[in-house]
Swiss-Prot record:
This is Flagellar L-ring protein. It comes from Pseudomonas savastanoi pv. phaseolicola (strain 1448A / Race 6) (Pseudomonas syringae pv. phaseolicola (strain 1448A / Race 6)). A lipid is attached at residue 25 (N-palmitoyl cysteine). The keyword Signal applies. Disulfide bonds: none annotated. Pfam families: FlgH. InterPro entries: Flag_Lring. It is found in: Cell outer membrane; Bacterial flagellum basal body.
């Protein structure tokens, strides 16, 4: 018996390709010290021309009859997280197809096609017929619910020309089993900020909220690489 030999180099290449495909199924892990979420310090105002006898400095005015709210780059705002999302969907499909056909030939060029059966019984003929039926049914349901509550204090990263505040920041918490983080970025109207410098996360436009973590607890909630292979779209069955 001839044996087919496979080069070891081909086996190595195939293994590397499989590992690469499986690594793409792994969710990226958040890392600390991301420059995008770093605290933004207040900008140093440009020195204005000296105004003899004046104590007013442009850019640092305050309303004597209003509340002090964040409105400059580097100011601090506390965001109250009150996110609740629920989604559900269902789909049902059914398809049925029936077909029946028959073919009967009794003569060809004027000659009969029916012949005597040498075994006995009925005469032989070229008549044919078939029946076909096909049925396909499908049913699918999905439901998901998420909730996130808490608070994160962020800084004003930029002030748009229309007065909208671009805020972003993060909170890292080191626990016994690893690290937990909450990141948030978005746009806030100054009118939505409460008197205590807090704003609800539901009032943030273009919000980017991330809740993730690292450590033993995060690892146990992730399936292994072998399980991810069978759950990936690349699995042929």
């Amino acid at each position: 018996m001839n044996r087919i030999s496979v080069p070891r180099f081909s086996v190595l290449i195939a293994s590397l390709c499989g590992i690469t495909l499986l690594s793409g199924c792994v969710a990226p892990t958040a890392k600390p010290n991301d420059p995008y979420y770093a605290p933004v310090l207040p900008r140093t105002p440009m020195s204005a021309a000296a105004n003899n006898g004046a104590i007013y400095q442009a850019g640092f005015e305050q309303n004597l009859y209003g509340d002090r709210k964040a409105f400059r780059i580097g100011d601090i705002i506390t965001i109250t997280l009150s996110e609740r999302m629920a989604a559900s969907k269902a789909a049902t499909s059914a398809m049925t197809k029936d077909s029946t056909n028959s073919i009967g030939l009794t003569s060809l060029f004027g000659s009969g096609l029916t012949t005597n059966n040498p075994i006995g019984g009925n005469d032989l003929s070229l008549n044919a017929g078939y029946n076909g039926a096909r049925t396909t049914k499908g049913d699918g349901k999905a439901a998901q619910s998420n909730s996130l509550t808490g608070s994160v204090t962020v800084t004003v990263a930029d002030v748009l020309p229309n007065g909208i505040l671009a805020v972003r920041g993060e909170k890292w918490m080191t626990l016994n089993t690893g690290d937990e983080l909450v990141r948030i970025a978005g746009l806030v109207r100054a009118d939505d900020i409460a008197t205590d410098n807090t704003v609800s996360s539901t009032r943030i436009a273009d919000a980017r909220i991330t809740y993730s973590g690292t450590g033993a607890f995060a690892d146990t909630s992730q399936p292994g690489w072998f399980d991810r292979f069978f759950l990936s779209p690349l699995f042929p069955f």
